[in-house]
Amino acid sequence: MNSKRDLAVAISFFVFGASVLYSLAHMQISPGVNEVYLTHYIIPNYVCAVIFDWRAYDTLGECLVLVVAVMVSWIVFGKSLYDNTYLKELFHAPESDDYITLQGWGEYTPIIKFLAFPMSVLMVALGIITVLGGHITPGGGFQGGALIAAAFILSVIAFGSNSPLWFDHKFLEKLEALGALGYLLLGVAGMFIGGYYLFNFTEINGFTIFPAPKEIITAGIIPYLNIAVGLKVLAGLSTAAFLLSCEKVIIEKISKSEEKLE
């Protein structure tokens, strides 16, 4: 049975691989659409132009996917799964005990902390540069926001509840809402200026939307879209990490309470 299954899998991979290679070898791409795009782009970075100028709706959808992912994490690992009142009554915990915190999270060794802090600072700086320069160089809001969130996660892992780089959960909620709302409002502004939602405009009454050197073509509202996406990704990934961290602390407290009851 196993040999027949392996043979079927091998044949399937062979047929699929041969089909892909055949398609790539005989692929013909009409340059018409490409020429239209390259004629009308106003941003010096092709990749960023694709993400925000030509498929901004798709980028908005990706942001909403991240929103849904964070909401699901909150449902599964957040307060909706654990009723604080029930847990306090069950395990005779004091009223002042808050289960949704990172208190009690242990720290790593001094060597890890010594290396983690400067690395976190450098990652935050790199993330900011990546967001602000995404319309000129490779990068953007997604990459920069992920870098800053990774710096936050690294600092929390190394320092625990005493992390020097800390985002309060309420602050993350506001930051995520600000990023998503900023993206939507910029799209509305484009609709009022150019007649199309998320239309990229470069100036209003002669005033440049985003300042740029004379030798660099202005990018319009795309830098602001990058900032909005960066805030959204930073807050979303950090919130997911926060919820998973709270889950760890909750499980530890429940285990300790069960041991005391036994």
From Swiss-Prot:
Predominant localisation class: membrane
Pfam assignment, any one: MnhB
Keyword Ion transport: no
Membrane topology recorded in Swiss-Prot or TrEMBL: Multi-pass membrane protein
Subcellular location: Cell membrane
Transmembrane segments annotated in the record for this chain: 7-27, 58-78, 114-134, 140-160, 179-199, 216-236
InterPro entries: CPA3_antiporter_subunitB (IPR050622), MnhB (IPR007182)
UniProt entry keywords in alphabetical sequence: Cell membrane, Membrane, Transmembrane, Transmembrane helix
Keyword Membrane appears in the UniProt entry: yes
Disulfide-linked positions: none
This protein's name: Uncharacterized protein MJ1307
